């Protein structure tokens, strides 16, 4: 009975460790690709003199500083999008929550909140507001293009 219990517990622990390993590995790969993409974006902004990144410590300090900027910004934009979707579901008859007006309001609120809540607190990242508007606008258009609003993309009726 005890051997059976320990054997069952070992399999559960092994399965949990495999799932955790896959989760950590895929997260590390994602963060690596994100880092390369952001490094390229920062080089483009520096080359065209649209941004200045003056925080330069060790690799891990830089990763933490610039990574937290991106992660906090993502959470702000994610929260705004979900809040706007919630408002649209709760007020379906309101003209502000339909069509292009809805997307313009979502984009404006997300960009403004990102700038005032996140960007102004990171003193070593100097990017003008209009450049942030263009970058977030491009990402918003990509989101609309690649993740269209629909009930079920696999519904073939």
Swiss-Prot record:
Coiled coil: none annotated. Involved in multidrug efflux. It is found in: Cell membrane. GO terms for cellular component: plasma membrane. The chain crosses the membrane at residues 18-38, 63-83, 100-120, 122-142. This is Multidrug resistance efflux pump SepA. The keyword Translocase does not apply. Signal peptide: none annotated. It is a multi-pass membrane protein. InterPro entries: SepA. Its main location: membrane. Keywords: Cell membrane, Membrane, Transmembrane, Transmembrane helix, Transport. The keyword Transmembrane helix applies. Belongs to the multidrug resistance efflux pump SepA family. It comes from the Bacteria.
């Amino acid at each position: 009975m005890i051997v059976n219990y320990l054997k069952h517990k070992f399999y559960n622990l092994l399965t949990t460790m495999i799932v955790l390993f896959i989760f950590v590995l895929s997260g590390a790969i994602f963060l690596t690709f994100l880092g390369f993409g952001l490094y390229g974006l920062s080089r483009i902004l520096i080359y065209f003199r649209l941004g200045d990144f003056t925080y330069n410590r060790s690799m891990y300090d830089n990763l933490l500083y610039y990574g937290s900027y991106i992660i906090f910004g993502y959470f702000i934009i994610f929260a705004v999008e979900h809040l706007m979707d919630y408002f649209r579901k709760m007020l379906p008859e309101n003209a502000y929550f339909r069509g292009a007006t809805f997307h313009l309001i979502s984009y404006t609120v997300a960009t403004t909140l990102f700038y005032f809540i996140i960007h102004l607190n990171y003193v070593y990242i100097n990017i003008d507001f209009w450049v942030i508007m263009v970058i977030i606008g491009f990402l918003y258009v990509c989101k609309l293009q690649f993740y269209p609003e629909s009930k079920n993309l696999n519904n073939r009726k």
